[in-house]
Design a protein with these regions (language model features):
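Long, hydrophobic N-terminal alpha-helical segment
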Residues: 1-43
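Histidine (H) residue identity feature
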Residues: 22, 48-51, 120
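Glycine-rich, aromatic-bearing surface loops/beta-hairpins
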Residues: 66-132
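Intrinsic disorder/low-structure terminal segments
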Residues: 2-3, 51, 117, 125
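Mixed-charge, polar/low-complexity N-terminal
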Residues: 4-5, 11, 53-54, 59-61, ...
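Structured domain cores in non-transmembrane regions
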Residues: 29-70
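Residue-level signal for alpha-helical context at structural boundaries
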Residues: 26-28, 34, 48, 90-93, ...
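Generic structural signal for short, flexible, solvent-exposed coil/loop and linker residues
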Residues: 5-8, 12-15, 22, 54, ...
Length: 132
């Protein structure tokens, strides 16, 4: 496990913010695809599955969803490779391993914060965040 100083953690904030901004856009696309799929399924049901098949858009939606999921994985992988723990993609919440007074802690950052300003014990979670 790699451990970060506060300075090293803050050096990653720009990368993290750009990544989660892009992820928010992809999340919106997923939501739109999901809504489109629900409409198609509703119309299929309403019309008792008449005149619906491969041309109704569901197959294309699934292909697009798979493409977006691959993009999400490609965006998150470099963060994970750095040893940063992605806790919530939608919120942009990460924990960054660090050492405080000889024990392992997590520096905590959420998308929108301009710097890493919080930490918590490894078993405390987000609700246990404390100001640095």
């Amino acid at each position: 496990m790699e451990f970060y100083t506060l300075k090293e953690a803050n050096a990653n904030v720009d990368l993290l913010q750009k990544t989660f901004d892009h992820l928010a856009t992809l999340y919106k696309l997923i939501t739109d695809l999901k809504n489109d799929s629900y409409v198609v399924l509703w119309e299929r049901e309403k019309n008792h599955n008449k005149h619906y098949g491969k041309d109704d858009g569901l197959d294309l939606n699934q292909l697009e969803l798979n493409r977006i999921i691959n993009q999400i994985e490609d965006l998150i992988d470099p963060i994970i490779q750095k040893g940063i723990i992605v806790r919530d993609i939608k919120k942009g919440l990460v924990d960054i391993p660090s050492i405080k007074e000889g024990r392992i802690i997590y520096l905590c950052w959420v998308s929108g914060e301009t710097e890493v300003s919080f930490w918590h014990e490894i078993d405390a979670g987000f609700s246990g965040r404390q100001l640095i």
